[in-house]
Regions:
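A glycine-rich, hydrophobic loop/mini-helix early in the fold
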Residues: 59-93
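N-terminal charged segments
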Residues: 1-67
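Conserved acetyl-CoA-binding loop-helix of GNAT-fold acetyltransferases
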Residues: 46-50, 165-173
Length: 173
């Protein structure tokens, strides 16, 4: 099971999210309306992404320093922590609502304000997104993005700055 997490984007795109992927047996990406994430199969070179990279900026995740193909430009590079929850902690859950398509404009505004990571026009369609509202206003949210056999990525975890420190993000996760 952990081997799937060694190349999580590929595992999702060639597994449970194959229906959302574009590409072939060497390289796949999500439709840019969902996210910019892309991956290559184990052992494949990043140049395998050339054909599908033309659809727009891509984001990759690697376990080692990648060899960047000639002509590519790195726009941003940062470390990512991958965590796995083996046991849920007993705690009182906050009162939350399930977010729907009608909530996307408000979700997008919260993401723009807090910058938890990529959130495209159709990201909400990856899975269930839940949120906390205060007097009708969306103040915190979290949702599912990549799905890998036995694992769901928790994504877009964010809380409006005026509501931070109340445990909303922890409760939603």
């Amino acid at each position: 099971m952990t081997m799937l997490l060694d190349n999580p984007i590929w595992s999702a795109l060639s597994g449970p999210h194959a229906n959302l992927s574009m590409g072939d047996e060497r390289a796949r990406r999500y439709d840019p309306d969902f996210t910019s994430l892309a991956a290559v199969a184990p052992g494949a070179d990043l140049s395998a992404l050339d054909a599908i990279a033309s659809l727009g900026t891509i984001g990759i995740c690697t376990t080692s320093e990648p060899h960047i193909p000639v002509g590519w430009q790195v726009l941003e590079q940062f470390a990512v922590a991958q965590m796995v929850c083996d046991k849920l902690i007993d705690r009182e859950l906050p009162s939350y609502v399930i977010l729907a398509d009608a909530d996307v404009p408000e979700m997008t505004e919260l993401v723009k304000l807090t910058r938890p990571g990529p959130f495209a026009r159709r990201t909400r369609e990856f899975g269930t997104f839940i949120g906390i509202r205060d007097q009708g206003r969306l103040v915190a949210m979290a949702g599912e993005r990549m799905k890998i056999d036995g694992h769901d990525e928790v994504s877009a975890v964010c809380t409006h700055p005026d509501y931070q420190g109340r445990g909303y993000a922890r409760g939603l996760v």
